[in-house]
């Protein structure tokens, strides 16, 4: 079962990226390294409920 999730960078509060994940295969929170235009570098974005 795939669900849509939002990715947020905790320090800057940016919520830029939308993606989907399979809850059965990844039950814990997803963390992806993405580009932050505000900081102009790659940082870790974490799944937000």
From Swiss-Prot:
Signal peptide: none
One GO CC term on file: cytoplasm
Superkingdom classification of source: Bacteria
Disulfide bond positions: none
Xref: PROSITE patterns: RIBOSOMAL_L33 (PS00582)
NCBIfam families: PRK00504.1 (NF001764), PRK00595.1 (NF001860), rpmG_bact (TIGR01023)
Protein name: Large ribosomal subunit protein bL33C
């Amino acid at each position: 079962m795939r669900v849509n999730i939002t990715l947020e960078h905790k320090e800057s509060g940016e919520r830029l990226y939308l993606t989907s994940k399979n809850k059965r295969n990844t039950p814990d929170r997803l963390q992806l390294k993405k580009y932050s235009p505000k900081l102009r570098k790659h940082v870790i974005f974490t799944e937000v409920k």
